[in-house]
């Protein structure tokens, strides 16, 4: 079964700052929980993403067991959106659409992840027992880190 995870977060910065941060693969380790041991393995010439870009990672999502993960950037609309698609990794399907909407308060970040686990019924069981909760925790951690990075000096309304 295909699942969808959607998150929004308003950050207090300009579109160029948001794009530069989120489109740089090396920043993923900053917004991923430390216990996942997320490491970008691809040596990147610079931080500019492009369609067709392949990025290799190592991550330990469960029981501290390292797994290889490879994504391809399948779509880029400069300073508006990009999509990463898992080519190799733990999911049967992983498609993450990142959208950036400039507004009077800075930038609204929208994440839409479409994903499916392998192994049919067993994958669905794993999803209901721990995978969904783990993904929500990862995006919750990310939200907290981004609040500190971008919104700590925001004036209360």
Model-inferred region functions:
Residues 86-137:
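Beta-strand/loop substructures that line and gate deep hydrophobic ligand-binding cavities in soluble
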Residues 15, 74-81, 99-108:
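A short, structured loop/turn motif at beta-sheet edges
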Residues 1-46, 50:
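Hydrophobic ligand-binding cavity/cleft-lining segments
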Residues 4-6, 66-70, 92-96:
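Short, surface-exposed coil-to-beta transition loops
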Residues 40-88, 141-144, 148-149, 153-154:
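Glycine-rich portal/gate segments that line the openings of hydrophobic small-molecule binding cavities
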Residues 11-13, 59-63, 75, 90, ...:
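Beta-strand elements of well-folded, non-transmembrane domains
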Residues 1, 156-157:
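Basic/polar N-terminal segments that are highly enriched at the extreme N-terminus
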